[in-house]
A protein has these predicted regions:
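Internal helix-loop-helix
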Residues: 43-107, 111-112, 154-160, 271, ...
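Glycine-rich beta->alpha junctions and the first turn(s) of the following alpha-helix
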Residues: 186-275, 338
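A short, Trp-centered hydrophobic/proline-enriched beta-strand micro-motif
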Residues: 112-120
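A structural signal for short hydrophobic beta-strand segments in well-ordered beta-sheet cores
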Residues: 134-137
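A short core secondary-structure module
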Residues: 142, 146-188
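Loop-to-helix element that buttresses phosphate recognition and phosphoryl-transfer chemistry
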Residues: 254, 262-287, 301-304, 310-315
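Amphipathic, small/basic residue-rich leader segments at the start of a protein or domain
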Residues: 1-82, 104, 108, 257-265, ...
């Protein structure tokens, strides 16, 4: 299918079908709105393009998924955060889950009937993910999971979790499971962050019983799964977030009375550089390339562009961030984490230096 024609048809459909969010801007309202948008797009087949037929999709280029995300997020119909979970976890299920499980579960995610979360980081294992300690112990046809995760986005609203556990020492001792969040022994505690939103959670697993058929891949495949998952965070997910940042740039220009051309130019240049890089990444993914450590470049560029944009907004909208309880304040505070979440910028630069430039460890 021609991407330009697809985008034009989608835009026409969105113009004719009102999916405008309501006045409630709480996190819970954002989650409900995301489900509403996904359901409408899935019922009209838009959400199914770019996904394999065996997982409930309609096939076609992967690029079509990026187009849908760009239009939905760029128009402000849904927030980029919940959308990113879909674009990260659905490919993971398709690649690692038993085919019958993927065929059953992926349509639930695409259609907005369910939201899933990603149980990776722990109190002592963030960027150093390989040190995770949540343990899974075999018990007949089940596995018993005990441990704690943290910074788990949207866990309080999630039906399932893609969970990394420790089954043996080292990288080869990490195993992934697909866990129902209503399983006895799971406790979710939302964390209030400085921007006032309970997006992140602590999740406790106290002798949680998970059937062996819910393992993703084989024992020890968890590290490979994580390495395959992270590039998806930096491909289609980033494309949506870029659309969101461009919409904020447009809003900044509309709201300011004194334009600082130099500051705006620098912010725009950072966004444009990011978009050009991400566009190349989209085309590589669409062409079947297996993304790797080079997506760390995309991650560094995104963090730089996001913080530059909201730093510019702070300078051009005096008091909007410091004195007013506005969305600019919330977004500025959230942007401070752009160099931390998904792997810190320091870690990304180390990856670029060691794995792309072969500069060694010193």
């Amino acid at each position: 299918m021609n991407v330009s024609e697809f985008q034009a048809d989608l835009r026409a459909w969105l113009d004719d079908n009102d999916l405008t969010p309501g006045a409630d801007h709480s996190l819970e309202a954002h989650i409900k709105q995301f489900g509403r948008v996904c359901a409408a797009l899935y019922d009209a087949d838009w959400m199914r393009y770019g996904w394999p037929v065996e997982a409930g999709g309609l096939g076609g280029p992967v690029m079509l998924r990026a187009v849908v995300g760009e239009e939905v997020v760029g128009r402000g119909l849904a927030e980029p955060g919940p959308y990113s979970m879909l674009e990260v976890l659905a490919p993971t299920m398709i690649d690692y889950a038993p085919p019958e499980l993927a065929a059953e579960m992926v349509p639930r995610l695409l259609s907005g009937r369910e939201l899933w979360c990603q149980g990776f980081s722990e109190p002592g294992s963030g960027s150093d993910l390989a040190s995770l300690s949540t343990r899974a112990t075999p018990d007949g046809d089940n596995w018993i999971i005990k441990g704690q995760k943290v910074w788990t986005s949207f866990a309080q609203y999630s039906t399932r979790c893609v969970l990394l556990t420790r089954t043996a020492p080292g990288h080869d001792g990490i195993t992934a499971f697909f866990v129902d969040m209503d399983t006895p022994g799971i406790t979710v505690r939302p964390l209030r962050t400085m921007h006032g939103v309970d997006e992140f959670c602590e999740v406790y697993f106290d002798d949680v019983v998970v059937p062996a058929e819910r393992m993703l891949g084989k024992p020890g495949d968890g590290w490979r799964l994580a390495m395959d998952l992270l590039p998806f965070e930096r491909s289609t997910c980033f494309w949506q977030r870029i659309a969101y940042l461009y919409s904020r740039m447009d809003r900044l220009i509309a709201e300011t009375t004194e334009t600082d051309d130099a500051e705006l130019g620098e912010a725009y240049l950072a966004l444009h550089t990011l978009r050009c890089r991400s566009r190349a990444t989209q085309h590589r993914l669409d062409g079947g390339t297996r993304l790797g450590p080079d997506t760390s470049i995309d991650k560094v560029l995104l963090a730089t562009a996001e913080q530059k944009l909201f730093d510019t907004a702070r300078g051009m909208l005096p008091g909007a961030i410091e004195l007013n309880d506005s969305s600019w304040r919330t977004e500025f505070l959230y942007s401070r984490a752009a160099t931390i979440y998904g792997g810190t910028s320091e870690i990304q630069r180390n990856i670029i230096a060691r794995r792309l430039l072969d500069l060694g460890k010193e």
